[in-house]
Amino acid sequence: MAAGDGDVKLSTLGSGGERGGDGSPGGAGATAARSSWVAALLATGGEMLLNVALVALVLLGAYRLWVRWGRRGLCSGPGAGEESPAATLPRMKKRDFSLEQLRQYDGARTPRILLAVNGKVFDVTKGSKFYGPAGPYGIFAGRDASRGLATFCLDKDALRDEYDDLSDLNAVQMESVREWEMQFKEKYDYVGRLLKPGEEPSEYTDEEDTKDHSKQD
């Protein structure tokens, strides 16, 4: 046998000594690597669980603070404990109004607030924060709001001192007026009609009045 062959066999045997017990190369190193990987995984998992626990504690603390102070703040906000004008007024009986009569119900001269849309008069007192003297739509209180709503105008130019028949509005604007009328019917009490000049008011019975209020409720 040549010396070179012997060297090769010895070298092969020597390298075989580095095999693991299962015959795989580098058994001890692989085991150590696996151990390190498992340890790292456990450490990462532990950190994640710790973070989740900390977040849960923070959320729990925030919830307890809200339960203790948040609700109290909501109940003691502006106007809390004070009854709205609508809560202190009896329900208005159905009747018809002239322009002059309607103007009395502007939230300043009387606590009740009325406005007209498309010839219908609505009691909007419960929406006083919108239609009261200081509200964003207070200009419509005690007035015919039809033209202003149809043209999206909140200026005095949208108001008429005389009866407004809306005859100069186009089809789109009139459709807008009708849509506003339906929305007011759904949300507020319909209390009567806005009278045209020379028109006589209708006489409403208690039964008709009760029936109308029942429909709105």
From Swiss-Prot:
The modification Phosphoserine is found at residues 84, 98, 202. Glycans are attached at residue 15. GO terms for cellular component: endomembrane system; endoplasmic reticulum; extracellular region; glutamatergic synapse; membrane; nuclear envelope; synapse. Interacts with PGRMC1. Interacts with AAAS. Non-classical progesterone receptors involved in extranuclear signaling are classified in 2 groups: the class II progestin and adipoQ receptor (PAQR) family (also called mPRs) (PAQR5, PAQR6, PAQR7, PAQR8 and PAQR9) and the b5-like heme/steroid-binding protein family (also called MAPRs) (PGRMC1, PGRMC2, NENF and CYB5D2). The lineage of its organism: Eukaryota, Metazoa, Chordata, Craniata, Vertebrata. Belongs to the cytochrome b5 family. MAPR subfamily. Residues 96-195 form the Cytochrome b5 heme-binding domain. Residues 196-217 are annotated as: Disordered. The modification Phosphothreonine is found at residue 205. This is Membrane-associated progesterone receptor component 2. GO terms for molecular function: heme binding; heme transmembrane transporter activity; steroid binding. It comes from Rattus norvegicus (Rat). The chain crosses the membrane at residues 40-62. The keyword Transmembrane helix applies. The cytochrome b5 heme-binding domain lacks the conserved iron-binding His residues at positions 131 and 155. Gene3D superfamilies: Cytochrome b5-like heme/steroid binding domain (3.10.120.10). Its main location: membrane. The gene is Pgrmc2. GO terms for biological process: adipose tissue development; heme transport. It is a single-pass membrane protein. Residues 200-209 have a biased composition (Acidic residues). Required for the maintenance of uterine histoarchitecture and normal female reproductive lifespan. May serve as a universal non-classical progesterone receptor in the uterus. Intracellular heme chaperone required for delivery of labile, or signaling heme, to the nucleus. Plays a role in adipocyte function and systemic glucose homeostasis. In brown fat, which has a high demand for heme, delivery of labile heme in the nucleus regulates the activity of heme-responsive transcriptional repressors such as NR1D1 and BACH1.
